[in-house]
Structure formats: structure tokens, C-alpha cells
Amino acid sequence: MTMEKQVPIVTFRTRVRDESISGPNPYRWEDKTTDDYFSGKRVILFSLPGAFTPICSTFQLPDFESLYVEFKKNGIDDIYCLSVNDAFVMNAWGKSQGLKNVKLIPDGSGEFTRKMGMLVAKDNLGFGLRSWRYAAVINNGVVEGWFEEEGFGDNCATDPYGVSSPQNILKCLKAPAFV
């Protein structure tokens, strides 16, 4: 569960709301780096196979959102959800979920996921390359806690979920032995 690994340096292509743009799509491109997300703070990063998928949309993302205040009370500055989806998909998913606290990171090309060693094929589901489900506690860009679902591998027939749940991570954060 504990490890000392620096997160890879990656640039993410994001879409951010811009009030100066009128019309139905008032967003502009903005590059954000891993430093923008992880430097100088202690965060939770959780990664999942895809936006709008059942476990991700029914349990994992909503539960992180609802437990946000509890995470803040336990020393977490921000919570990020990452998926190998583009910025348009991630923005639409966030809007459909009514997010107020959890921030979404689009890893459209899968570069971050690949450099973390978590890129898997999900061709059996028609997804292509996606992230294996995991979560991490990251302190100033260094992974200090690791929560990876069992069964890592290409075209896994199941979608394990539990180890990377917000409830499990919160329990670990509250434990005296956690870093």
C-alpha cells in the first residue's frame, strides 16, 4: 500500500470554461501539467476504466464526491479523477454527475496512465486501451499510498472494485500507521 514513487511529468489537454466565449460551447483549450495538479499539496488521485461506465458512475465518482469533506478533514487538499477519455467526454461526465468538488483529468492519449504502468487493453469490452482501476495518495508529486484493484491485466473478464473505493482509502487515512 505504501510506496515512494514520483508521478510522471505529463501535459494534459483540458477544456476550461471561458466567460469571454459566447455560444453553446464556451470552453477553451488549456494545457495542465502534473505539477499543476500535484505540486505543493496532498491529493487523492483515482483512475478508472471510463467515464459513464456503471461502477465508475454509480459508485466510485459519486462516493468520492459525497465524502469530499471527510477527506479534507483527514489532510487531503484535492481529489482528482483520471480516465483515458478526452476532455469533451470528461467535461460531459462531470456535468452529468453534478460535480462540485472532485476535479476530472482527461488522459486522452493515455500517456500518464502508461507511465504509471496502469494502461491495459479492454478490447473485450470494445474500449481499447484504458486505465486499470487504482487510487493513490500523492503528496507534493510523490505517491505515498497505493490502492490497486486485484487482477491487473489485459482484457480482464471482471471489473474488480473495493481496494480503490473512497471508503477504503478513508479508513486507511484514519489509521495511525498510515504515512
Curated annotation (Swiss-Prot):
Active-site positions on this chain: C56 (cysteine sulfenic acid (-soh) intermediate (for peroxiredoxin activity))
Query: Under the GO molecular function aspect, what terms does this record hold?
Result: thioredoxin peroxidase activity
**What's in the keyword line of the UniProt record?**
Antioxidant, Oxidoreductase, Peroxidase, Redox-active center
Question: Is the Oxidoreductase keyword given for this protein?
Answer: yes
The Thioredoxin domain, residue ranges:
2-152
Keyword Methyltransferase present in the record's keywords: the answer is no
**InterPro entries in the cross-refs:** PRX5-like, Redoxin, Thioredoxin-like_sf, Thioredoxin_domain
Q: Which reactions are catalysed by this chain?
A: a hydroperoxide + 2 glutathione = an alcohol + glutathione disulfide + H2O
> Which cellular component terms (GO) are annotated to the entry?
cytoplasm
Q: Name one GO biological process term.
A: cell redox homeostasis
Give the main EC class. Answer: oxidoreductase
EC numbers: 1.11.1.27
What binding partners and quaternary form does the record give?
A: Monomer.
**Role description:** Thiol-specific peroxidase that catalyzes the reduction of hydrogen peroxide and organic hydroperoxides to water and alcohols, respectively. Plays a role in cell protection against oxidative stress by detoxifying peroxides.
Other noteworthy facts: The active site is a conserved redox-active cysteine residue, the peroxidatic cysteine (C(P)), which makes the nucleophilic attack on the peroxide substrate. The peroxide oxidizes the C(P)-SH to cysteine sulfenic acid (C(P)-SOH), which then reacts with another cysteine residue, the resolving cysteine (C(R)), to form a disulfide bridge. The disulfide is subsequently reduced by an appropriate electron donor to complete the catalytic cycle. In this 1-Cys peroxiredoxin, no C(R) is present and C(P) instead forms a disulfide with a cysteine from another protein or with a small thiol molecule.
Q: Which family does it belong to?
A: Belongs to the peroxiredoxin family. Prx5 subfamily.
Protein name (Swiss-Prot/TrEMBL): Peroxiredoxin
Native source organism of the sequence: Rhizobium etli
